[in-house]
Amino acid sequence: MAVKSLVFRRKFPLLVTGSLLALQPVAALTVQAADQFDCKVSATGGWDCSPLQNANANLPPRPAHTATSVSTAAAGSSVSGSGGETVEAEPTQRLVTESGGRALKSRSADYSHLDWIPREKLTAAQLAEIGPYCGGSYIEPVRPGMDDGAPSDESPTYVSAKASRYEQEKQIATLAGDVVLRQGSMQVEGDEANLHQLENRGELVGNVKLRDKGMLVVGDHAQVQLDNGEAQVDNAEYVIHKAHARGSALYAKRSENAIIMLKDGTYTRCEPSSNAWTLKGNNVKLNPATGFGTATNATLRVKDFPVFYTPYIYFPIDDRRQSGFLPPSFSSTSDTGFTLVTPYYFNLAPNYDATLYPRYMAKRGMMLEGEFRYLTHSSEGIVNAAYLNDKDDHREGFPDYSKDRWLYGLKNTTGLDSRWLAEVDYTRISDPYYFQDLDTDLGVGSTTYVNQRGTLTYRGDTFTGRLNAQAYQLATTTDVTPYDRLPQITFDGFLPYNPGGMQFTYGTEFVRFDRDLDENIYFNDDGSIRGKRPDASLQGLARATGDRMHLEPGMSLPMTRSWGYVTPTLKYLYTKYDLDLDSQGKTDLNKRDESFDSNQDRSLPLVKVDSGLYFDRDTTFAGTPFRQTLEPRAMYLYVPYKDQDSLPVFDTSEPSFSYDSLWRENRFTGKDRIGDANQLSLGVTSRFIEENGFERASISAGQIYYFRDRRVQLPGLTEKDLKRLNLDPSGLDNDSWRSPYAFAGQYRFNRDWRINSDFNWNPNTSRTESGSAIFHYQPEVDPGKVVNVGYRYRADARRFDSSRGTFRYGNENDIIKQHDFSVIWPLVPQWSVLARWQYDYNKNRTLEAFGGFEYDSCCWKLRLINRYWLDVDDDAFLVQSEKADRGIFLQIVLKGLGGIVGNKTEMFLDKGIQGYRQREDQAM
C-alpha cells in the first residue's frame, strides 16, 4: 500500500520518519537503539507503526543491484545477506560507458525506461511533431509538480513509498517499494531510498529516475541533496524530450540551478536503437535555461568511428540562438577555385545579432562578409558589408574595376508612430562585375542591379502620402542605365463622404527622372573589347531626363446585389512634363525632322463600366456533389486617342497579354503611355466547389472586342518607327477588331494533385501567342513526394532592344519554348531521388539539370547531387554566360548539430523544385 503524500518544509524534510515515531505511545520510545519500526498506512490515512523484532521481517525483498551501485553503507562489491553474511554482488547491469553511446536494452527491451513511445502508439498530434522517418518519440509523462516553477529551497518535499523503517540512533530512514521524492519540478524515483536526516541527503538505489522539466535521467544509484535539489546519478542515461535528444554518462550531476553535468558523457539526436552519430566529451554540460550545451575534449563519432575532434564545442539542445560557429560550406568554381566559408554567429542580445562570413577563395584570396541584424519596438533592419583584396588579375584594365572589391548596404524599416513609416533599402558595390565574379551570403535580391531607396510614408484615415528617393546601380555592363527617381512624391486617397453612394478618389504623383549615361567600352570575359556600353545606342527622346506630374481624380457609383454588380467609373488623367535633352538627343531628332518640346502636357478622360453576374447551382459529378458557379463579366472601356510620340518613356512597358489583361484600364504599365481604347471585354468564370468549401476546379475564358484601332504604341513599335528602321509594319497587331482568346484554369484531382494552365490563342494570326501548363503533385499526408511537370510557350514578347535603344517585338530568337521537370521521390524507406531538368527547345540547350539521391533518418541526412546550369535572365531572354557551370554538391546534416557541409545545396533545391520548402518544413 502506498503512503499518502505528506508535505515537509525546508530544513526538516526527513520528518517523514520522525513523525511516525511521534505518533506512538511514549513508552514505545524506551526500546533499544537498534530497534526498528514497521509503519503502514492506517484506515484514517495516518501512520500505524509497531516495533520489529527482526528488522527485515516485513520489508519487501531488496532489489538486486550491480557491483557498481552504491549501497547505503558504502560503494563496494559486496552486500549483506539476510543472515548477515557477506554476498558478492552479481554484475547484472551493463555500464553505459561500455555501450558506445547506445541506449541500454538491459534496462528495458523497448527503451521505455527512456520514455520512448513507438511510432504506432503516438497520437496524431505527437506524430506531427516528429519527422516522417522517426520510429517513435520521447514523450514526457504527466506527473504532479512537473510545471512547478518555485525555487527548490522554497519548495516542500513530497515522499511516498510502500513501506519504511527508521533507525533512531543514526537518524536514517529507509523507504522501500516505488519510492518517490518530489521537490518543486524535480522528482526522483527508485526501488529503495535511505534518507539521512542530519545531512539533508537522500540516497536511492535500483531503477533510479530523476525527472525535471523536459528532462529524464536514468541510473542505478542516485544521491540527492534535499535542501537545494542537487543530485548525482551513476551509470546514467538521459533524455531531453523536446529536443528529441539522449545520451549517457559515467555519472550525471544536477546542480541547484538545474544544469546537468556529465562525466564521460555523450549526446545524440538518434533513436535509442541507432548510433549513427554521437558527440562524446570528457565533461559535458547541458543548460536547459540557455538551451545550449558544451563539451571538452569532444569527439564526433559516426558509426563508432571518430571523424572530428575539438578541445571545446558549443552545441544547441533546443531551438534557441547562441554565439558560435555555424556549419561551414565548401564549393569549387572556375571563377573562385576551391572555396571555404566558415560563418561565425554572434548572439549579442535577444533583439540584435551579427554573423561574420570569412570566405577563403583559392584564386582570389580571403574575403570578409558581415551582417548585423537588429529589432527594436519601432524598427527592424540589417546592416551588411564585404571586402576583398582580389588577387585575381583577370579584369585588370577593365573600366570601373579595382582590386579592392567591396559591398555595403542597409535595410531598415522604422515606424515613427502609428501613421509615419520610414524605409531604407540601400546597397552599393565597388564595380559592375561584383556579382559575376563573387558569391555572397548577404542576401542581395538582384545580381543585375542594386537598389538605393529611401521612403517616408504617412497614412491618414482617407489618404496616403509618400516621399520616395530611389536610385539604381548597375551590376552588369550589358544593360541600359535605369532612371533614378529623385524624388518621387505621391498622394492618393478618397473623399470621406459618399453622396448617393458615389465614391470619389484621387491620385497624384510628382517624380524627377534622371540618370548619368555611361558610354564607355566594355569587354568580353576573355579581355577582348566588345564595344561601347548599351547607353551609347540610346537615341532621341530615349536620352531625355525631366520632371513628370500626374493627376488622376475619379468618381464611381458601385451598385451591388447578391446576384451581381454594376460599377460605372469616370476619371480624368492629366500629365505634365518638364524635360531636358542632351545635345546628342537633339541631334538625333533633327536628323528625323522632329522637334523637341521641353514643356508638354497630356489630358485624357477615361470612362469605364464594369459589371458582373453570379449564378450557382447544385450538381453532381462522378458521384460527388458540387456547387457550380457561373460568373459572367463585361467591361466597357473608353479612352480617346492622343498622340504621345513626343513624350519620353521613363517607366513604361507593355506586359504580355493574359486573362487579367481584359480588365485593365491601361494596357501599359507606368504613366508615360495611356492606351487609347474603345473596347468591350467579355469573360466568364465557372467554379466547382465541394460542400466543405474545397474548390475542385475553375476555368475562365474571355476576349476583348475593339471598336477602334489602337494607335498608341511604345517607341520603336509604331508604324512610323518601323518604316524608319526599314522594317515591315504589316506585323503590327494594333488594327485587329478582337484580341486573342484568353483562357486560364486549374483543376485539383484531389488535395494532392493539381494542374494550372493558361492559354492565349490569336484568331487573327491563327497561332498561339502564349501558354503554360504546370502539373504539381504533393500529398498532404506525405509531402515528401513531389512531382512537377511544366511547359511554357511565349511568342508575344515586347522587349527593349539595347542595341537600338528602342522597344521591338520579339523575334524567333526570343521565343520561349521550355519544359521543366522536377521530382523528389522515395525509392525505399529513407532513400529518395531528387532531380530537375529544364530545357529550352528554341535554342536546343539544357538550362539546368541536376540529379542525385538523399538519405534521411531521424537523426541525420545526406544528399549527393550532380548539377549543370546556365545563368539565364528571364526578363531579357538573355543567357548571361554561354559557358555552362558544373558541380557536384554534397550536403550532410546531423540533426541537432546542423549541416556539416553543403548548405548551399538548399538554395538551388528551393528555387528549382516547387514544393521542396513545404516538404522540408513539414519534415521536422
Swiss-Prot record:
Keyword Membrane recorded: yes
Q: What are the start and end residues of every segment in region (Disordered)?
A: 58-101
Any single Gene Ontology cellular-component annotation: transporter complex
UniProt entry tagged with the keyword NAD: no
Q: Where is the signal peptide?
A: 1-33
What is one process in the GO biological process aspect for this record? regulation of polysaccharide biosynthetic process
Where is this protein primarily located?
membrane
Q: Where in the cell is it found?
A: Cell outer membrane
**Keywords in alphabetical order:** Cell outer membrane, Membrane, Signal
Q: Which InterPro entries match?
A: LipoPS_assembly_LptD, LptD, LptD_C, OstA-like_N
**Where in the chain are disulfide-linked cysteines found?**
none
* Low complexity bias spans: 66-90
Pfam assignment, any one: LptD_N
Similarity section: Belongs to the LptD family.
Q: What does this protein do?
A: Together with LptE, is involved in the assembly of lipopolysaccharide (LPS) at the surface of the outer membrane.
Q: How does it assemble?
A: Component of the lipopolysaccharide transport and assembly complex. Interacts with LptE and LptA.
What protein am I looking at?
LPS-assembly protein LptD
* Species name: Pseudomonas aeruginosa (strain ATCC 15692 / DSM 22644 / CIP 104116 / JCM 14847 / LMG 12228 / 1C / PRS 101 / PAO1)
Provide the taxonomic classification: Bacteria, Pseudomonadati, Pseudomonadota, Gammaproteobacteria, Pseudomonadales
